[in-house]
Amino acid sequence: MATTSPESATQSVKGPSTRILVRFTAAPEVTAEQYDETIRRLEKAGDWLPEGLEYHVAFRADGKFRVSEIWDSRDQLDAFEKRLMPVLDDVGVEFASRPEMLEIHNIVKR
C-alpha cells in the first residue's frame, strides 16, 4: 500500500520543543472500521496512546476519514510514525494527500 509518511510533509516544523498540529486525510475508500482496527492493533501492541500526543480527533468530512492531532514535539511524532506506518499498511489505510503539519502558536482551552 502506498502511504505517505508524516516525515515527508512540510519541512518547516523542526526541533524537539515545537508543538505541532498534524492533519491527515485518508483516501476516500478508507472506512471507520479500518480506523478502529488500526487503533485496536496499536493498543494491543502497547503503542496507544503514544507519548507526546496531546489530542487526537478522528472524523468524517467531505466523504473522507480525517484525523487531526496535537503533538508535544516533532521528534515524538516521528518516533510514533515508525510504529504506526506498518500498521496502516497492513490494515490498508492510504492517505489522500501528504499530511499537513503546522507549528502551533497558541492553544486556548476552556
PLM regions: where:
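Short S/T/G/P-rich N-terminal loop/turn motif that feeds into the first structured element of a domain
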Residues: M1-R66, D72-P86, V93-R110
